Amino acid sequence: MRTEKVLIDLRDLIPSDLPDGREIVAEGIALGQNVTIGESLYCKEKGVKSERQWREIAREKGIPCTCMNIGLSTWDETRDALENIYEDALVRGIRPPDRFNLIAERRMGLPKSKRAEAPQETGPCLWDEKDWWELTQTVPIQPEAADNMIGGPGSLDNVLDALKVGITCVGVLSQYTWRWPYWDDETTQVVSVVKAAGVLAAKKADGVVFDSYLEDGYPGVFHDYASYIGWAMLERYVAEDLIGAAYASSWGGLTQNPIIKSAVTLALEAVNPNRVPISFLQGDTIGNTPDFDANMAVLVNDLMFSKMTDLRYKLGTAPIAVPVTEVERIPDWKEIAQVQTISRKCEEYLPLIENTIDWRKIEMLRDKLVSGGRQFFNNALRILSDMRIDIRDPAQVLIIMKLLGPAKCEELFGVGDDDDNYLRGHKPVLETDLVRQTMEKRTALLSSIEKLGPEGLLADKTIVVASTDVHEFAKFLLTSSLESVGSQVIDFGINRDPEDIVKVALETGADSIVITTHNGVARTFGTILKKKMAEAGVCSSVFMGGVLNEDVEGSDVPVDVTKHLHELGIQTPGSLEDLLAALR
């Protein structure tokens, strides 16, 4: 029995000050009943009360909807970009995007009183009522209050502000597993999430939707697509059955194979009893390379299958066209507008191609994933119940799932035949594209390292490895490679603050600190880290890799900060081989 793998009493993970989640929901519903939902330009133009209402109309009429991600350095720049993208579509004679996901800065996840003092990262913050109002009143493109809106300790603040201006889809539930800058109060965070969800539940009859993006949570590092389905069922169980909100399971960015993507999308729809439209299908982000021209092929391949799946099965979703430059930096408005044009052009070809696809094979794969997902879900509730967790308390369920972590969740609840040759202890029903790619990279890296011979060993080195953000697999490749050359690796995890990294380096006597970063904070993070190291007398060498850029005043897009990092004394090796050479 997999319960034998639980070496602790799960009830010990529940904070002693955690209130009853049902009472939190009731408080949220009471708050929500006193909120008046505003009217957006988009909903006014469509003659509907909510985005969900229009999606349900559109799917029955066969009207394709589209979505885009946007979030430049400031809200003013983002607002101007929205106006330019909208005007560009009109000039080209195409339908503008239907919606945009605001990719806000991580500070938005904090309570309002904590945002100004937290370190700036990439993306806009909404600082006042005017900023919020402009979200829905600048152009008739419907916004989702997406990244960093629900999940953090500032969830309730954000939900109330979003509804008042006419935003009827708010996310991101999966981000409740994140850690926000300088925030370690688990109870306050989960209470804010659950209460915000209660507010959304109060507005379900008005078409308000509680959105998730699976890959931003634990599914992003799951090894099995069946676990994706099971996790979505768990989120829906909490959001719909326990809280009473309407739940949508958006997903897609970490899958390259279009057949698999269609099958997983259909599996998510199959476990969606209320047919809440999947808010968006994120475009493929792992097939892109620094060759922007080649990325056009990735874009079209991904869009065509997502759109055909949506059209054939009347899903009412909105695929996202990923700008071809996004692999290296945040795109500017012209690059976002470019792929909106491509997306609309793809729609002209859907009727010509859709009937040539053998959808039976995709449906068979869908059914296999649904079966595995249901088993994952049932395993989770059974094991939690066996361990005396109150599975009717949304706060308890959420916090236990978070504190178990992705690896333990999949080990305990995952399906497939038991097999210790696989990292999670059982053979996946369908291995994820990202895990497959990562393991292939790992094998190639370890093979390359093996050729270095004894002179490549770092057996006398203690190395702290950490990530500034949620990107788990880059850190996994680093730790695997460093362990293979004999280093004592201190895996300090993801979403770490510089002060905490310094403490660990001091406590372990680390020779080096290796940091992976992808959230536009390289310069600020590096500056604070080096300052705190000097104050603590830590002399470890520091290495940083990933996306080494940051927003700077006067630039529409983040700029490279490698030179600044070098001035701080932080090394930026361009490859793992270069890192190993520098560590020696």
Residue ranges and their predicted role:
Residues 1-27, 337-452, 456-457:
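Long, compositionally biased intrinsically disordered regions
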Residues 8-11, 23-225, 551-563:
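Active-site beta->alpha loop and helix N-cap motifs at the rims of alpha/beta catalytic domains
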Residues 125-129, 154-155, 179-195, 256-264, ...:
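Active-site-adjacent beta->alpha loops and helix N-cap segments on the catalytic face
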Residues 137-148, 205-209, 272-283, 461, ...:
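Short beta-strand/loop segments at the ligand-binding rim of alpha/beta enzyme cores
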Residues 171, 176-329, 534-537:
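Catalytic alpha/beta core domains of metabolic enzymes, predominantly
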Residues 434-492, 500:
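ATP-dependent carboxylate/acyl-activation modules
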Residues 479, 483-485, 490-566:
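Cofactor-cradling patches in redox/metallo enzymes
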Residues 569-579:
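Short acidic-hydrophobic, aromatic-tinged amphipathic segments that line or gate anion-handling sites
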